[in-house]
Amino acid sequence: MGMSLDPATETDEEIDIFIEDGKIAKRGKKLKCKAERVIDAAGSYVMPGFIDLHVHLRDPGYEEKETIASGVRAAAKGGYTTILAMPNTKPVVDNADVVSYVHKKAESEGLTRVLQVGAVTKGQQGEELADIKGMVQAGSPAISEDGKSVMRTDLYREAMKIAAECKIPVLAHCEDIHLVQGGVVNADEITKKQGLAGITNSVEDVIIARDIILAKETGARLHLCHCSTKDSVTMVKQAKADGLPVTAEVCPHHFTLSTEDMVPYDTNYKMNPPLRTKADVEALRQGLKEDIMDVIATDHAPHTKQDKNQSMQKAPFGIVGIETVAALTYSELVLKGYLTPMQMAEKMSYNPAKVIGSDRGSLEVGKDADIVIFNPKKTYQIDKNNFASKGRNTPFDGRTVTGEVEYTICGGKMIYEKEMTGEKA
């Protein structure tokens, strides 16, 4: 028996859950059922399996950074039962064939469920729309040009119209490329003293404003990826007040670290959007607390050691995060009073499911048995050398955190348990 947190029904109670044929068959106190295995979750939280709307699996084309196999192992270890893979691979996921390739390869692993997001434009070149309807028919739950924004507003508006017709969300990477001007970190006094070119908040905010306007015009469901600025929270709040179909996600690095935490010239602190100021961090935390910001996602972006072992100007943007997100969320948001444990479950499972129109993210009877068991008392240091991901590019190596995923169950199948790794819970 563990503390069940079900955001779908807003119930938190100590109950037993009985799984049969991959489904949640029964739930209640002191169930008497014949089971092949019993897991004692006393003292732990039992939550719906996490859903990550923002993962870079790098496959096809960049398998030296991550493979589908290593990516789903990392996801399972992080408590994820469903992840959305971004389309900026090689080739770009701009047609049904590549969507099917990823889905079949992920299914063969038998671990975390992978849903492949389709690109907005062919080759992500921003000039011609991809086969959006074909990709949706092949199983894409959403479209995104992640890694960049579609700068041709007329083309993007047309894509949003198609997305609305197909009843899928647009996952928006908001970055005005004309305002970046070679920036590699946030534009503030700290980074200026280091002689690094800065990325202003306006780079993100301008495109957020544009995309909200287009959502209003087209009726498309807009989901804003990796929001990092205080004004992003303000704009999302206003969009919701106006009744627009707008949701937003925040990543752990953006609600945990500011530019004051950066180790100078350490490329593991280089991501896009960049780390912002303390004021931005606090605004994001308050936005999550007040349920303005809906989702916690990772933007898991593995790179090789060689990739990152370059100057700040040359090294690629991105950090890994799928194995550290639960602990960081619990340590930085729950223990510090910004979120309740129920809100954590909501933002990591139920709300992401709603964004993509899925009925997952629930522990109700009859639902797929997608479950994560999370120990809220375990304190330890993050060790990048223990990652299942091929990527080791994290700014959190050595950081002391509280909270650990002990078991991940996907469709009734145990896909991760801590004891499998040889570690003691």
Regions found by a protein language model. Give the residues of each.
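Histidine-rich, glycine-flanked metal-binding segment
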Residues: 1-48
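Divalent metal-coordination and catalytic microenvironments
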Residues: 2, 22, 43, 54, ...
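Metal-associated gating/positioning segment near the N- to mid-region
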Residues: 41-106
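Active-site mouth loops of central-metabolism enzymes
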Residues: 53-66, 87-89, 115-128, 195-202
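Alpha-helix-loop-beta-strand connector modules within alpha/beta enzyme cores
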Residues: 96-113, 161-172, 324, 328
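Histidine/acidic residue-rich metal-binding segments in metalloenzymes
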Residues: 129-296
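His/Asp/Glu-enriched, well-ordered alpha-helical/loop segment
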Residues: 193-221, 268, 289-296, 301-376
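C-terminal cap of metal-dependent C-N hydrolases
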Residues: 311-314, 368-425
